[in-house]
Amino acid sequence: MPERIVKPMPQDPVTKPGDEGPRTPNVPKPDTERLLERMRRVDPRQAQRYRQRSGE
């Protein structure tokens, strides 16, 4: 059986050009006015507590 050929490993990681790695998705933040209105319809006290917590 022939000897195994050992090739030197590159020190820097192999990357494709233009590939900067993972990034956060561009997702718009929810509209807080509509959120508070929906919460008021469901549970007015919970909406009031949320408003106090979030500083609204």
Curated annotation (Swiss-Prot):
Domain of life of the source: Bacteria
Keyword vocabulary terms for this entry: Isopeptide bond, Ubl conjugation pathway
Region annotation (Disordered) ranges: 1-56
Biased composition regions of type Basic and acidic residues, renumbered to the chain: 30-46
InterPro entries: UBact (IPR037543)
KW Cytoplasm (keyword) present: no
GO molecular function, one term: protein tag activity
Cross-link type Isoglutamyl lysine isopeptide (Glu-Lys) (interchain with K-? in acceptor proteins), residue numbers: 56
A Pfam family matched in the record: UBact
Family in the record: Belongs to the ubiquitin-like protein UBact family.
Function: May function as a protein modifier covalently attached to lysine residues of substrate proteins. This may serve to target the modified proteins for degradation by proteasomes.
Name of the protein in question: Prokaryotic ubiquitin-like protein UBact
Organism: Acetithermum autotrophicum
